[in-house]
Design a protein with these regions (language model features):
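Oxyanion-binding/catalytic loops of NTP- or PPi-dependent enzymes
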Residues: 1-170, 175-193, 198-212, 219-705
């Protein structure tokens, strides 16, 4: 995907030599970014808009935040409407340029304001500019909150008809529609199942909105360091699916950078920690990062050579700080309606905005205060919401949410297969993991661990270090032997005969990784083979998630079971799965790429794992039955080829073929019994039995459906 036309600022910078490596923490609540400059071996000096030096080793972190009175919106984008006549166009343009010049590298949230213009005031026709600008600050609540776009990260890459998007749309003030594209086969437009932001008479894809945010990070870095960004690493939750990851990479490309890499949030944080604090021995870390809409947990091992290995990862891509607001929102609103208040939610966007952000602010206040007050005058035009809230009240409302966080932590430790006593450090990131009661509960579980909670913006800084390492620009002795090993979230395999899954990469496999496995054809004179790639923990394809299909054509036509095919699974650092298939000893191959995390969110992943655990015994029994029936079927086919011309033997073979066709579900032992019976009724052929023995020994070769 091509990026936007290069800005004048970039054209005037020195030719890109990969000097600047940019790390971006694409959070739900804000975007923060950090830079590594290879020309500065140590402290990097950068001036902010107040002419103050920022010191932080060899990289800088400048965050983006917006203060909406009492709130910092999630990735807020303000699409404001202005009527402009022909006589005022030049004046408006100059004013806009002046405002943009003043933005500097303030601590801004991901807010973007898109201005609309009117060519003819008499017609009152709104025409919206495609190029938004970042809002610096709003002193009061916005006058048009329905044009403030937030939660871009959560919507990016979602399907329009997904249950998740349907659910979150209920709490959004701005409008989302399904994208429609021209259909070449008809005059009508066809639905794409892709959500877009609705702005009056036009729509804007969320990839485009996200690109404005990434472009601001890139422009700020280049403006202040007077050089071009070479590599960009964006950190995201580990559970982001293939569509979300690709959408983020596309957004960065739209912003003008082609060299983009993806890394998990928790991994990025540990990279920074390993760089900042010298580790003298192997240590185990539990790291938890809770944003506005996600919870990431991981158990990681770091040795003294700065080799970072993720042992397990988990959490919930739909659980975050907003969940702690919901019980309070429900309590306040129900009390307000019961006391005679008017229903204002969704009916009055501005007052709804005030109400929701006041609840968010109250939650934050209770982090450092024991009591706070929500005071909203005439919220419905007539009645007030005035409510005093203590920490104890808030904790009681969120007991179930606290328990759920602890469950996620317990699960990720269990999957790491280490003893809890081996943990040395616990790192808590994100504002929601500063809630006093939640910190207390986690502390009680890990009393002997070193707690680290005051590390701000370390995810973006870790991403910047990784960007430098990725571009071979990390001129640091500390990270001379630096390596990162992440893991696959679910098992990956292909469907084989009998609907069985042949696992090629088990869940928790270290990435990057490349594995090849051999298979055989299942039909005589087969011309092509279809491979179906699945992820999941169940034994049968119908119980797992289909990732992709590839077809290998032009294979050698021969008897079934004689043509050997190689299937290769390769997962890179971005969790991108590439599948290749070729006939053994032939150069021709086919391949396809898919993200190893597929289309599932963390909740679906956890559900699949739980189902797989409960069904494991049943699946294993069914698998054994299917394999036994296939062995009998193979024997019938071989005897048909060997003795098909002998009428007496043919009738015996046909008898067992009919039994197999009508047997239904029988125990594995019954298939084995029939197989032995059939072998005893056939003439003994030494060559055949020698071949059977070799087949038993060659267990690595399986049949492809």
């Amino acid at each position: 995907m091509e990026g936007e036309e290069e800005s004048e600022q970039r054209k005037n910078l020195p030719k890109d030599d990969g000097t600047l490596a940019l790390g971006i923490d694409f959070g739900s609540c804000r975007i923060s970014s950090a830079v590594w400059n290879k020309n500065k071996k140590g402290t990097q000096l950068v001036k902010d808009q107040n002419k103050n030096d920022i010191y932080f080793d060899a990289f800088l972190s400048f965050e983006k935040e917006i203060d909406y009175g009492m709130n910092r919106l999630n990735d807020g984008v303000d699409i404001s409407s202005k009527y402009i006549d022909d006589e005022k166009k030049e004046e408006e343009k100059n004013e806009k340029e002046k405002k943009e010049e003043d933005y500097g590298i303030d601590r801004l949230n991901e807010g973007v304001e898109v201005s609309n213009k009117q060519k003819d005031e008499g017609k009152k026709e709104e025409v919206y500019d495609d190029k938004p600008h970042i809002i610096k600050e709003l002193k009061e609540f916005p006058s048009n909150p329905e044009n403030v776009v937030y939660n871009i990260k959560q919507i990016l890459g979602q399907k329009y008809n997904s249950d998740y998007l349907k659910k979150i749309k209920q709490n959004l003030i701005f409008k989302i529609e399904e994208e429609k594209k021209e259909d070449e086969k008809s005059e009508n437009k066809k639905n794409t199942n892709r959500p877009v932001f609705k702005l009056k008479n036009k729509t804007i894809p969320f990839e485009k909105l996200a690109s404005y945010l990434f472009k601001k990070c890139i422009d700020d870095a280049e403006k202040n360091l007077k050089n071009k960004v070479g590599n960009v690493v964006v950190s995201i939750p580990h559970s982001f699916n293939k569509i979300q990851r690709q959408a983020i990479k596309d957004a960065v490309r739209i912003a003008g950078i082609e060299n983009v890499h993806i890394i998990n949030d928790t991994t990025a944080a540990l990279i920074y920690y390993a760089f900042k604090y010298h580790i003298h021995k192997t240590e185990y870390f539990l790291i938890c990062d809770m944003g506005q809409n996600k919870l990431d947990c991981a158990v990681v091992r770091i040795n003294k050579q700065n080799c970072i290995k993720v042992l397990s990862s988990g959490g919930d891509n739909r659980f975050g700080g907003e969940k702690f607001n919901q019980p309070l929102i429900k309590l306040l609103y129900e009390n307000f309606i019961n006391d005679g208040g008017n229903d204002f939610l969704k009916k009055n966007p501005k007052e709804t905005f005030k109400f929701l952000t006041s609840v968010e602010m109250a939650k934050r206040n209770l982090t450092f205060m024991k009591e706070t007050e929500i005071n909203l005058q005439k919220i419905d035009g007539e009645n007030d919401i005035i409510h005093s809230l203590t920490r104890e009240d808030f904790d009681k409302l969120n007991e179930k949410n606290y328990a759920y966080v602890l469950e996620c932590i317990d699960q990720v430790i269990k999957e790491s297969k280490i003893d809890r006593s081996q943990l040395n450090n616990v790192i808590l990131l994100g504002e929601s993991l500063r809630i006093p009661k939640l910190v207390e509960l986690i502390g009680e579980k890990f009393e002997d661990c070193n707690f680290i909670t005051e590390l701000y913006n370390i995810i973006s800084q870790g991403a910047a270090i990784y960007a430098a390492h990725w571009g071979n620009k990390l001129n640091s002795d500390k990270f001379k032997n630096f390596k990162v090993y992440d893991i696959t979230q679910l098992s990956l395999g292909i469907r084989t005969e009998g609907d069985l899954i042949s696992t090629i990469l088990p869940r928790g496999s270290r990435i990057p990784i490349k594995v090849t496995k051999s298979f055989l054809t299942t039909q005589d004179h087969q011309k092509k083979v279809k491979f179906e790639v699945y992820q999941g923990e169940r034994k049968f394809s119908k119980d797992n998630d289909l990732l992709c299909r590839i077809i290998l054509k032009g294979i050698t036509e021969n008897s079934r079971g004689t043509v050997e095919l190689d299937v290769t699974f390769e997962v890179n650092e971005d969790n991108i799965l590439t599948v290749k298939a070729n006939e053994k000893n032939k150069n021709e191959e086919v391949q396809i790429s898919a993200f190893a995390n597929g289309n599932m969110d963390e909740e679906e992943v956890k559900k699949l794992i739980e189902i797989a655990e409960r069904a494991r015994k049943e699946d294993e029994e069914k698998e054994e039955r299917v394999k036994a029936s296939l062995r009998l079927y193979e024997l019938i086919l071989k005897f048909t080829t060997m003795f098909g011309e002998n009428e007496e033997l043919w009738s015996i073979i046909e008898e067992y073929r009919n039994w197999l066709m009508h047997a239904g579900i029988v125990p594995k032992q019954e298939y084995e019994k029939k197989r032995i019976e059939l072998m005893r009724k056939m003439p003994r052929d030494e060559e055949f039995y020698e071949e059977e023995k070799k087949e038993e020994e060659k267990k690595v070769v399986e049949a492809v459906a």
